[in-house]
A protein has these predicted regions:
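A conserved mid-protein helix/loop that constitutes part of the nucleotide-sugar donor-binding site
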Residues: 69-70, 251-274, 284, 291-297
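A short, histidine- and acid-enriched strand-loop-helix "catalytic/donor-clamping" loop
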Residues: 160-178, 190-193
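Donor nucleotide-sugar binding/catalytic pocket of nucleotide-sugar-dependent glycosyltransferases
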Residues: 189-239, 247-248
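A short, well-ordered alpha-helix in the C-terminal region of glycosyltransferases
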Residues: 281, 395-409
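Short alpha-helical donor nucleotide-sugar binding micro-motif in glycosyltransferases
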Residues: 314-315, 322-327
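Aromatic "clamp/platform" in nucleotide-sugar-dependent glycosyltransferases that forms part
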Residues: 335
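Short hydrophobic beta-strand element within catalytic cores of glycosyltransferases
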Residues: 352-355
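Conserved acidic donor-binding segment of nucleotide-sugar-dependent glycosyltransferases
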Residues: 367-368, 372-379, 388-393
Length: 426
């Protein structure tokens, strides 16, 4: 992907952005250019907003999640925006919604339940769009709500720009059901754009659809400085964890997430069993809960890992950030994962991160720099990557804020995203 935009005093007012979308090989060049041009890019959008009214944006999204807050706040700053959520919490898991809403820079609104009990049949969107008269609408994935937006566009406002946010990994995109493929075809044809969270998926879309200018890239990430401040504030709790679990001198592996089948956690324990004799100081912290917890505890005991595995339960807020501070090597072993927002959190916390190749968040890993990738079907592959990480990992000595391991910052990604977006909506 490459972006060229104007720098001279006269050219700063132009709206003719040149955007082309390519694969991962050129992502580094793009984002490094965003680093050099960061001030110019921000000033360009600032001037554009000063001379022109902000465009009206309506966002329809399933729920408020911690890994979306910064993105929503950025949209709210860039547009005259209003946000409607379908549910009071994320369906698959529960978050502390009161604290999350305290981080929002806007007032959230919530849609009425779906008609006839169908969750995405939200006919209320018609009255909202008639009232708000937006220039741009964001929605999520491929579903009935998105089709309702198209009906409104066809009947009342052909100029309406509609974008959907799709979290699919490449594997999920390739294995889509017939119904999803049909919905995706309609969206690609009639929407203004699709926001993808993985650059390999973007390349896949470009290859399979003749509409490359419609595909935008923005991973699921949080603001570096804000998240790292949360980590810093959690350091006293981290020191308590060090004492509670006797972690000093141990090589601390970390998993954060639900203890469910798709996370592939028996596989992780089996891979750990292959290396633990060579690295007897290794200890794996499971932070999360789920229906496999008891079975995982028994599996760890049967495989001689009782002294090398700790089940901490589900944690949120400061209690969760404290675990990122003590973790040295983070592992996401999922065999099915749309993205994996925990990878961004682990990298921001300075954890060397081992990520399954099927997770969308694999795009955040720079092998041999901030982590590595592995095949979630090969125990020996993960065991080798664990051994490499442990070989370079000293035991935990001092609880402190580790260096950020994200390759690029939130600001770099969001500037690039808004330049892509503005090239489409004008």
């Amino acid at each position: 992907m490459s972006i060229d935009f104007c720098h001279s005093a006269t050219e700063e007012l132009c709206s003719d952005f040149s955007v082309s979308f390519v694969g991962k090989s050129e992502k580094r060049g793009l984002l490094e250019n965003e680093t050099r041009d960061e001030q110019g890019g921000l000033e360009l959008r600032k001037n554009k907003t000063y001379f022109e009214m902000k465009k009206k944006l309506v966002v329809f999204h399933p729920a408020i999640a911690p890994y979306r807050v910064d993105f929503f706040n950025s949209l709210n700053k860039e547009f005259d925006a209003i946000f409607y959520f379908e549910f009071g919490d994320v369906l698959e898991q529960s978050f502390a919604q009161d604290k999350l809403r305290g981080r929002l820079k806007f007032v959230p609104h919530f849609l009425a339940p779906g008609l006839f009990g169908i969750k995405n049949l939200r006919t209320q969107v018609f009255s909202i769009l008639r009232k708000e008269q937006p220039n741009v609408v964001f929605c999520s994935e491929y579903n009935i709500l998105g089709l309702l937006l198209l009906v409104y566009k066809f009947l009342f406002n052909w100029k309406l720009s509609i974008f959907t946010i799709c979290d699919d990994s490449k594997e999920i995109a390739e294995s889509a059901t017939l119904v999803k493929r049909c919905m995706r075809f309609i969206v690609v044809k009639f929407y203004s754009g699709i926001i993808l969270t993985n650059d390999d998926v973007l390349s896949w879309y470009v290859k399979h659809f003749q509409a490359k200018q419609k595909f935008l890239f923005f991973p699921i990430i949080q603001k570096d400085q804000d998240f790292r401040l949360l980590l810093e504030n959690a350091l006293p709790v981290s020191k308590m964890l060090e004492d509670t679990y006797h972690l000093r001198g141990r090589q601390v592996l970390l998993f954060v997430g639900r203890l469910i089948d798709i996370k592939n956690l028996f596989f992780l324990l089996d891979a750990l069993a292959l290396v633990v004799d060579r690295y007897p100081k290794a200890v794996l912290l499971f932070v999360g809960d789920g229906d496999q917890r008891v079975a995982l505890e028994r599996h760890a005991e049967r495989n001689g890992l009782a002294d090398h595995v700790i089940f901490a339960g589900k944690k949120q807020g400061k209690d969760l950030y404290a675990y990122y501070n003590v973790g040295q090597i983070f592992v996401l072993p999922s065999y099915y994962e749309r993205f994996g927002a925990v990878v961004n959190e682990a990298l921001l916390a300075g954890c060397y991160t081992l990520c399954s190749v099927v997770a969308g968040a694999a795009c955040l890993i720079e092998p041999q720099k901030n982590g590595d990738l592995f095949d979630p079907a090969s125990k020996t592959d993960l065991a080798e990557k664990l051994a490499e990480g442990l070989e370079d990992c000293e035991g935990l000595r001092q609880i402190s804020l580790k260096a950020n391991k994200m390759g690029y910052s939130y600001d770099q990604y969001i500037i690039s995203f808004f330049n892509q977006l503005n090239s489409i909506i004008g």
